[in-house]
Design a protein with these regions (language model features):
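Enriched but not universal
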Residues: 1-7
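A structural boundary/capping signal
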Residues: 7-143
């Protein structure tokens, strides 16, 4: 059974790093995506920045130690993702941002939390942003 709900209810996230590493293995195909998702469960009513990789009609979400391959239509429906609020990057574009910015993302959107009520303290690090990329990985990107 698909456990996308579990991904969307995780309090701590490594999605930008996980998706960034994943796109590095899909140099000729696929897109890195930074977008806004709507949380479920304890994160219901909270919209937050998230990252994943799309290859054809599949979404690959390796955040929080998971290795999910989910049909894109289902992923977008469950996360109530608006494609107009997403940024899509081919490998070369993602690699350029990684080199220029020195972190996994987000690069062109805030990736911040958008909601009407306060975030519980335990949920304060949804989708950790601007995690630095180790030098050895940056060196591989510049080759």
């Amino acid at each position: 059974m698909i456990k996308l709900k579990r991904i969307l209810t995780e309090a701590m996230g490594d999605c930008y790093q996980a998706a960034g590493r994943l796109i590095m293995g899909h140099t000729g195909k696929g897109k890195l995506v930074h977008g806004m998702v709507n949380g479920q469960g304890s994160l219901k009513g909270i919209r937050f920045g998230h990252a994943w990789v799309e290859v054809g009609s599949k979404v690959l979400d390796h955040s929080n130690g998971k290795k999910k391959s989910i049909p894109k239509k289902l992923y977008y429906a469950m996360g109530r993702i608006n494609p107009k609020e997403c940024k899509y990057y081919k490998y070369k574009d993602a690699a350029k941002f990684m080199l220029d910015k020195g972190h996994w993302g987000p690069w062109e959107m805030s990736g911040g939390v958008v909601m009407a009520e306060e975030i519980p303290d335990a949920k304060g690090e949804v989708g950790k942003k601007n995690q630095r990329i180790p030098k050895d990985i940056l060196d591989k990107l510049s080759d």
